[in-house]
């Protein structure tokens, strides 16, 4: 299989700078098990650092067993997702708003980007339900101190890309990492064909 000629060909376009609502895709050389082929949605990026959640790491723990009041709104497979290695005992919730819903001033919702919001898990699910297409709940998160993520991006550990609202709720059976790459322009889209098992290469 043909391989990229030069890793520098796959540096994120200048327009894609890290901010809330962007995604970090693990580059093919990032083989550390926690983040290999991971897709991280950036929730916060400011002077205090960066916080995001891994979108494609489902666990086997049912939402109902942890937060039963939110199980009805959770999208399939209705399990907790592993948001990252930090504070695994803490839960963070993202949702995609229905088209036309404005989250401004709504108790329990905090706008992230576009139709994506953070949901306060202490809120009443019944009050949130009419406004969202579904929720996804993460155990833990991924975090970087000031300058740490920038260093990893310069090292080409991460590809910075824009996100679609639908990316947040994609079912685990979909290879989200490859799907996002396939919709990018050449030559970046070539990375989508990179094998999951390196032994196949």
UniProtKB/Swiss-Prot annotation:
Cellular component, GO annotation: cytosol
Q: List the disulfide bonds.
A: none
Spell out the InterPro entries in the cross-references. Answer: AlgH-like (IPR003774)
Alphabetical list of Pfam families matching this protein: DUF179
Similarity section? Belongs to the UPF0301 (AlgH) family.
- Output this protein's name: UPF0301 protein Mvan_6057
This chain's source organism reads: Mycolicibacterium vanbaalenii (strain DSM 7251 / JCM 13017 / BCRC 16820 / KCTC 9966 / NRRL B-24157 / PYR-1) (Mycobacterium vanbaalenii)
Instruction: State the taxonomy lineage.
Output: Bacteria, Bacillati, Actinomycetota, Actinomycetes, Mycobacteriales
